[in-house]
A protein has these predicted regions:
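N-terminal secretory signal peptides that target proteins for export/translocation
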Residues: 1-4
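Histidine-/acidic-rich catalytic cores in large beta-rich domains
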Residues: 24-355
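Bacterial N-terminal signal peptides
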Residues: 7-20
Length: 355
């Protein structure tokens, strides 16, 4: 093998340095979702689709503070949703490029863009999949007295979701054949008290190993079940809003009450943790609900914020260096969940998207 040239050696060194500091190394190929974003701004996309309902204008108008790390709304293309503002936002090239409004009521909690461009989301009263042109291709309405806060695509033809209720149930539905392939009752703090329904669950994920990772928000634990719903792993934490199985085998958990994001291993040892107090004061957030682990090792934390007073998104490196703070209440509402669209992977392939 001939010796490396100086420019190539320098390039390799820069890539290694970028990886070491949790920054993006040059990608070998574009992320698949980036290639389809032009569909959302094509001439055939209506401002308000036939199934949409307009929302009350946002009440936050404070401009973004100057000098925040990163590139504001231009840092990443992303799908962005938040409790308290029923308008889903697709951000691309630093601006809102597409929206999906769902009227009054509660609440956006989970969102996925699929590799075919469709968007799967929960809206508490229902779970639905829409095209970039805002055509509804599938929808399931929660029965009276139940709620849906979490969903996940499994391939392009199946959807997993949890229905809070008495009892709560986990479903896997084939949206093409309409067949219910899985319907399983989940534990709950009460099977008779309607007041406990809302706080039962916010996040459940189907893993690359074919298991179900369930966050019991009110019961204070994250439980992993095998395909037959036998418990194979659990972790106690006061109010787990979300948990995602990482590609390294660890589990990334966000706790709403303690405002923390914690990575634990199979032995239940904490290997990484982030709290607002770990950050410089101007970058501190409150009301954290979900978090995303990017392919470069960075973590993006979502916050409902304080109506314009604190950041909505914060991205940190593994050593907790802040590389991006998004505080833009003039254009965006609270951040409950975000899907970073320039991250590699096929979202509907379990385990590819760590959000």
């Amino acid at each position: 093998m001939p010796p490396l040239t100086a420019p190539l050696t320098a390039c390799i060194a820069l890539v290694s340095l970028a990886i070491a500091f949790g920054q993006k190394a040059p990608a070998a190929k574009p992320a698949p979702l980036v290639k389809i974003l032009n569909r959302f701004t094509s001439p055939g996309v209506p401002v308000l689709g036939p199934a949409e309902s307009d929302v009350t204008p946002r009440k936050w108008d404070k401009p973004a503070p100057s000098g925040l790390p990163g590139n504001g709304m231009a840092q990443h293309p992303m799908l962005y949703i938040g409790e308290g503002y029923n308008k889903m936002l697709l951000v691309n090239n630093g601006k809102v490029a597409w929206t999906y409004s769902t009227g009054s009521g509660f609440e956006y909690d989970d969102v996925w863009m699929l590799s075919n461009g469709n968007v799967l989301f929960t809206r508490m009263q229902y779970v639905a999949e829409v095209t970039p042109e805002k055509k509804v291709v599938w929808r399931y309405d929660a029965p009276a007295g139940t709620e849906i806060h979490t969903c996940q695509p499994i391939g392009l033809d199946k959807v997993m979701f949890v229905q809070n209720g008495l009892p709560p149930k986990l479903f896997v539905v084939n949206i093409k054949t309409k067949a219910v392939e899985v319907e399983h009752d989940l534990p709950a703090p009460s099977l008779t008290d309607k007041a406990t329904i809302h706080a039962q669950f916010r996040r459940t994920r189907y893993t690359a190993q074919g298991t179900y990772l369930v966050s019991f928000l009110e019961m204070g634990k994250v439980v992993e079940y095998d395909k037959n719903f036998r418990e194979i792993w659990s972790y106690e934490i006061p109010t787990p809003w979300a948990a995602v199985r990482l590609k390294n085998g660890n589990t990334l958990i966000t706790d709403e009450k303690d405002i923390l994001t914690r990575e634990v291993n199979r032995k239940k040892e904490t290997v990484w943790e982030l709290r607002p107090g770990d950050l410089p004061e101007p970058y501190r957030y409150i009301n954290t609900q979900s978090a995303t682990r990017l392919a470069n090792g960075n973590t993006v934390v979502c916050s409902r914020g304080t109506e314009g007073k604190t950041p909505q998104l914060v991205e940190v490196t593994p050593d907790k260096r802040v590389v991006w703070v998004l505080q833009d209440w003039a254009n965006l509402g609270p951040a409950t969940a975000v899907q970073i669209l320039d991250d590699p992977g096929i979202p509907e392939r379990p385990g590819d998207s760590q959000h």
